[in-house]
């Protein structure tokens, strides 16, 4: 048989397989989520996220040191405040948990890249992502507090903000606030296509951010929709976003691909808590090889078109990249 084309030629050895990889990964493209609890001293394991921790303000640099030891130089900060109220006033307080954490991290590790999550759900006593009018979130009033919160983060030293609230017009409101207060060069990572997903459960337990009534389907996206994600991304581009995001990742690879093809901005994907917890649970039950599944799922997200990935596996993936198992 005279076979001219033999694809197996490029699969014969590890060296040639690595040479011909189409998808390349780097630890520079990994972002590690860090949970900072204002009421905590030291470190406390997160029950709903095995292998992850809450850090107190006195131990948050430990999280940074651990990240750096694996080659991770980017984090996204989530805060758990002592005080919650109807308007989430702790979110923009000068001595708020995120503001203190940012100052502490940047004082100790000025080159470590700190992204802050901007939302109200961890700070409101009702757990919704904005200011309520009855049982509805008032979009435009919420823009005011989101802008105020984002400004307080960058004033404390944050390198980038990531608004996750899904209010209409929030990118424009924050961009205008930054530009008028001397932060025109501070980038915004927009949670552009954030779906009302069932995969957020472990995070909401870890962050204490579950809504006390109702759900978030009135502002987060319907999982049935794909074209709407392009509309949301286009709006964020027009409002001044610097980076777009799709969240969750694994169940929305088609959306990542669509957004990658449609827009030139860098694209982030968030591999959320439920994705992480599923792998952990399946591994604990002896059903899958955790390491291989971790690597394969991350590859699928980058192969779909993501430029960067927020993941609870960031440190482990960085180690896998160093070993040459992926990347």
Model regions: which residues?
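N-terminal amphipathic/basic leader segments beginning at the initiator methionine
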Residues: 1-21
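Alpha/beta enzyme core
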Residues: 13, 26-31, 38-327
């Amino acid at each position: 048989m005279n076979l001219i084309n033999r694809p197996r030629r490029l699969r014969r050895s590890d060296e040639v397989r690595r040479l011909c990889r189409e998808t390349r990964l780097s630890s520079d493209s990994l972002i590690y989520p860090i949970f900072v609890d204002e009421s905590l001293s030291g470190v406390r394991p997160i029950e709903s996220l095995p292998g992850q921790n809450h850090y107190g303000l006195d131990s948050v640099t430990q999280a940074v040191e651990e990240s750096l030891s694996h080659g991770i130089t980017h984090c996204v900060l989530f805060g758990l405040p002592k005080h919650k109220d109807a308007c989430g006033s702790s979110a923009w307080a000068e001595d708020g948990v995120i503001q203190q954490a940012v100052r502490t991290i940047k004082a100790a590790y000025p080159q470590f890249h700190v992204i802050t999550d901007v939302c109200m759900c961890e700070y409101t006593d009702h757990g919704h992502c904005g200011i309520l009018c009855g049982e509805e979130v008032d979009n435009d009033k919420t823009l005011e507090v989101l802008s105020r919160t984002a400004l307080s983060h960058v004033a404390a030293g944050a390198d980038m903000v990531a608004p996750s609230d899904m209010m209409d017009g929030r990118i424009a409101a924050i961009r205008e606030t930054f530009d008028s207060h001397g932060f025109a060069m501070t980038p915004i990572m927009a949670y552009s296509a954030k779906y009302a997903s069932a995969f957020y459960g472990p995070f909401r337990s870890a962050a204490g951010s579950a809504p006390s009534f109702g759900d978030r389907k009135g502002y987060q996206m319907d999982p049935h929709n794909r074209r709407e994600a392009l509309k949301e991304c286009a709006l964020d581009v027009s409002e001044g976003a610097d980076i777009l995001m799709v969240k969750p990742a694994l169940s929305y690879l088609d959306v990542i691909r669509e957004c990658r093809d449609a827009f030139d901005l860098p694209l982030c994907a968030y591999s959320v808590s439920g994705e992480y917890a599923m792998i952990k649970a399946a591994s604990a039950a002896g059903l899958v090889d955790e390491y291989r599944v971790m690597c394969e799922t991350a590859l699928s997200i980058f192969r779909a078109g993501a430029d960067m990935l927020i993941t609870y596996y960031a440190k482990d993936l960085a180690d896998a990249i160093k070993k040459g198992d992926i990347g």
